[in-house]
Amino acid sequence: MSRSEELFLQAQKHIPGGVNSPVRAFKAVGGTPVFFEKALGAYIWDADGKRYIDYVQSWGPMVLGHAHPEVINTVIDAAKHGLSFGAPTERETTLAEKLCSLMPGMDMVRFVSSGTEATMSAIRLARAFTKRDKIIKFEGCYHGHSDSLLIKAGSGALTLGVPSSPGVPAVLADHTITLDYNNAEQVRECFAELGEQIACIIVEPVVGNMNCVPPVPGFLECLREVCDRYGSVLILDEVMTGFRVSPTGAQGYYGIKADITTLGKVIGGGMPVGAFGGRRDIMQMIAPSGPVYQAGTLSGNPVAMAAGLKTLELLQAPEIYPHLYARTNQLVEGLQTLADKAGIPFTTNHVGSMFGFFFTEEKKVTNFKQVMACDIPRFNKFFHGMLERGIYLAPASYEAGFMSTAHTQGDIDQTLGAAEAVFSSL
């Protein structure tokens, strides 16, 4: 029995399912989840001491790689001065100024402790600002586990949605409309019928929770247009894409400006953090400036703020993003070439340093239905084949992969060598 198997049995005694977030349990791919003990740069080591090249990167935050020495030293120094104050610090103001200088349309920002808190608070704020209740989200997008967002589509575009988890009151579905991602026509039809009731649209500009699915040309522009026309708030959930796809997030990459942006992951440098920010007239409605309540004991945590500031400082180096783009291009193009050579139906998507791949006959994957139709059993075999060869990919076919600045040419070569062997066995 491996050490991971032993630890998983032990964990299940006191942790539901043995994990603290469902995807970690390997339910999607089968087998025992790998328990990890340490990570450095592009590598992560399991409890038995086996090293893997890591393309999960803690689900996106580690754009500089694991345990970057400058970030680690900054965290140690900050921790020596106190782990939490529950009071204002200069550091949170400095990070707020930095975010507002980099993110399009962000005049003010409020820090929280997770992406879920950020999206939940952004929706509450949008509802208060517009004095409306209905929200639009998209099938396949994930915005955390708050009740209003755990709603899946009904039987038709404008039918009521239904909760996607027990414990979510059905009445919340009355206010949540779930549409097809990348379907601009459907969005326009929905607004034509219900526009005066819609408080906001919330969307992942690049969907990282049905693998990696970019917006088709004109889709984000359509969202901006209908929100402007009907007085609704456009919320871009950049928890995953913020400082991951470009130095100014997906908004800078695609030239779209949100009314409210949610952030997380990279802005904490690996520490727990989230944020939501946007137009001054909207953000000033948050307490204590305005009537919309939001609070948190650990919001603006000084250690997390220090890690975030150092990470963003390092990301300003001009060579960072071109390097990330080149490495990501090399990986996905290499995978496509190898799959084609092996005669495996396969296609890839990537934006910046996010990437995804699909076992499908489709030439381009742009929506949730296509993702659901992919060959998941074949993905699972590929995942385990790569894992055996020391390559750690996301343990689910619906999750994006991530490149870091720490990945080397040797890492890419080793990954493609492993992929060639696995493709030949499928």
Swiss-Prot record:
Cross-referenced InterPro entries: 4pyrrol_synth_GluAld_NH2Trfase, Aminotrans_3, Aminotrans_3_PPA_site, PyrdxlP-dep_Trfase, PyrdxlP-dep_Trfase_major, PyrdxlP-dep_Trfase_small
Kindly give the SUPFAM superfamilies that the UniProt entry links to this protein: PLP-dependent transferases
**Pathway(s) this gene product operates in, as recorded in its UniProt entry:** Porphyrin-containing compound metabolism; protoporphyrin-IX biosynthesis; 5-aminolevulinate from L-glutamyl-tRNA(Glu): step 2/2
Alphabetical GO CC annotations of the entry are:
cytoplasm
Q: Where in the cell is it found?
A: Cytoplasm
Please state what class of enzyme this protein is.
isomerase
- Catalytic activities: (S)-4-amino-5-oxopentanoate = 5-aminolevulinate
Entry superkingdom: Bacteria
Q: Which GO terms describe its biological process?
A: protoporphyrinogen IX biosynthetic process
| Pfam families listed in its UniProt record | Aminotran_3 (PF00202)
Q: Which residues carry this modification: N6-(pyridoxal phosphate)lysine?
A: K265
Enzyme Commission code(s) on record = 5.4.3.8
Named cofactor requirement(s): pyridoxal 5'-phosphate
* UniProt keywords, alphabetically: Cytoplasm, Isomerase, Porphyrin biosynthesis, Pyridoxal phosphate
Which is one GO molecular function term here? glutamate-1-semialdehyde 2,1-aminomutase activity
PROSITE patterns this protein is in? AA_TRANSFER_CLASS_3
Protein family membership: Belongs to the class-III pyridoxal-phosphate-dependent aminotransferase family. HemL subfamily.
Q: State whether it acts alone or in a complex, and with which partners, per the record.
A: Homodimer.
Q: What is this protein called?
A: Glutamate-1-semialdehyde 2,1-aminomutase
Q: What is the lineage of its organism?
A: Bacteria, Pseudomonadati, Pseudomonadota, Gammaproteobacteria, Cellvibrionales
